[in-house]
């Protein structure tokens, strides 16, 4: 703050006089482009500047930037008092509040949000850090009837029961690690937003919501996940609990599921879904006669683009093994599989059900070679549609495993145009020999080009890419990837 004040005091008298002749509205527009802390520091320039910063339409306030809790509370209260007199023009507010004691900022945040939400607020971002349940900030009733709000992010707050919600302009909402009065409260909140398009929900094990229900006629993008926090070590025990997620969103185009332990996953009206990501931990009820898994996979079977973790792929493979009739992913054109554990997954089962796949990326993180990936047969897409394959090997992955997988595609893909082996670290002698053997293999496709890429920094220089095309022309060129 002192450096900012010195910088402001460094203005020449002529410059200060020139700026002071501008209207408050113009000065506030100039201050808008400064960080909030520096904009506030202009209040010491003169009596003319004392309150101009209060007209800024965008404030980003962090309680940690203040010398004490009382200073932070006093600052906000002063702003609100001025706004009541001057008719606040605040459009965007971000509050980052660190609560180390139960009485810190007690009820203040609720009061502040209750005030700004009644005006022309369009963008609200509230995050509370280092809290305990008894320290949770309760969102005021006025928040639920903010007529101008189009963006809302709430992080670690408490949302109670409300009888009426009116958010006619809200298009983007992020709800992260909050606690809710009950699951009906959350369902009502989501379904009462008539133009909501982008929704992300990060759940907590103890958020009072067992079954998350997302019912929306307007939603186009959805992200759902669990944050385990201190419970992560024991997350396996939560599989036995009745967590669930139900999604009914006919306009949904993009769905991302991350670290989700819900036994039940029900999706309906997914005809518009174009892309799905299933990352991290994954669980779904897989009892032999249970229809939950079948209905889930059928529900997402129309996607064109899929990114999936090996855990989710394992569940899918397990399901395909037990069912005579499995869903076909006929629209699937692009697939990325992240492999981070050694529990074997059989890709053939899934690829057999993806007859029109054109592009495939395998990202290898695991250290254990033991049957991480296997193929029980040559899938149909290798014989008719697959044109691009990339094997990405992280610095923790096994290069020889990646090359072994690449070998299968080179030997069996009829229309393959390019295969890339992408390593995050340089190849040692054993891996180089394996790659040279890969280059020497007879290729099922006459168009196939094999490329090796080593990341910049892993060998002391720029990325280098070596490729061998069908005519055996050997090239060495910088990587542009």
Curated annotation (Swiss-Prot):
SUPFAM superfamilies: F-box domain (SSF81383). Residues 17-64 form the F-box domain. It comes from the Eukaryota. CDD domains: F-box_AtFBL13-like (cd22160). Residues 370-423 form the FBD domain. This is FBD-associated F-box protein At5g44490. It comes from Arabidopsis thaliana (Mouse-ear cress).
């Amino acid at each position: 703050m002192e450096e900012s004040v010195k910088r402001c005091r460094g203005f020449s008298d002529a410059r200060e006089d020139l700026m002071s002749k501008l209207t408050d509205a113009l000065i506030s527009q100039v201050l808008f482009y400064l960080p909030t802390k520096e904009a506030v520091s202009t209040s010491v320039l003169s009596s003319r500047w004392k309150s101009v910063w209060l007209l800024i339409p965008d404030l980003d306030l962090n309680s940690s930037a203040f010398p004490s809790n009382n200073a932070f509370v006093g600052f906000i209260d002063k702003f609100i008092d001025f706004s009541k007199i001057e008719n606040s023009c605040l459009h965007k507010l971000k509050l980052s509040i660190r609560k180390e004691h139960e009485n810190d900022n007690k009820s203040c945040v609720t009061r502040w949000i209750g005030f700004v939400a009644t005006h022309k607020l369009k963008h609200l971002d509230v995050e509370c850090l280092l809290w305990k349940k008894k320290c949770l900030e309760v969102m005021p009733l006025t928040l639920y009837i903010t007529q101008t709000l189009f963006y809302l992010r709430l992080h670690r707050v408490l949302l109670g029961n409300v009888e009426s919600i009116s958010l006619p302009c809200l298009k983007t909402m992020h709800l992260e690690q909050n606690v809710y009065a009950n699951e009906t409260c959350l369902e009502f909140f989501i379904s009462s937003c008539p133009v909501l398009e982008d929704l992300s929900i990060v759940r907590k094990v103890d958020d009072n919501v067992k079954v998350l229900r997302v019912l929306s006629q307007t939603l186009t993008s959805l992200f759902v996940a669990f944050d385990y926090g201190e419970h992560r070590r024991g997350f396996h025990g939560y599989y036995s609990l009745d967590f669930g997620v139900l999604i009914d969103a006919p306009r949904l185009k993009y769905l991302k599921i991350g670290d989700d332990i819900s036994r039940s996953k029900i999706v309906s009206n997914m005809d518009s879904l174009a892309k799905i990501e299933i990352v991290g931990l994954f669980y779904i009820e897989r009892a032999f006669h249970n229809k939950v898994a079948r209905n889930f996979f059928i529900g997402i079977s129309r996607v064109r683009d899929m990114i999936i973790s090996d855990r989710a792929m394992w569940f899918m493979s397990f399901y395909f093994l037990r069912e005579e009739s499995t869903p076909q992913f006929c629209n699937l054109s692009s697939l990325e599989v992240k492999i981070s554990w050694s529990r074997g997954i059989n890709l053939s089962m899934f690829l057999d059900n993806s007859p029109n796949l054109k592009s495939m990326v395998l990202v290898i993180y695991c250290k254990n070679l033991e049957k991480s990936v296997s193929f029980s047969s040559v899938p149909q897409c290798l014989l008719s549609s697959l044109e691009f394959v990339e094997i990405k090997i992280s610095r923790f992955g096994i290069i020889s495993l990646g090359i072994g997988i690449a070998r299968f595609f080179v030997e069996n893909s009829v229309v393959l145009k390019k295969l890339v082996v992408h390593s995050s670290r340089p190849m040692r002698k054993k891996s180089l020999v394996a790659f040279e053997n890969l280059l020497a293999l007879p290729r099922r496709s006459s168009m196939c080009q094999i490329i090796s890429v080593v990341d910049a920094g892993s060998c002391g220089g720029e990325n280098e890419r070596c490729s061998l095309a069908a005519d055996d022309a050997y090239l060495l060129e910088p990587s542009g990837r």
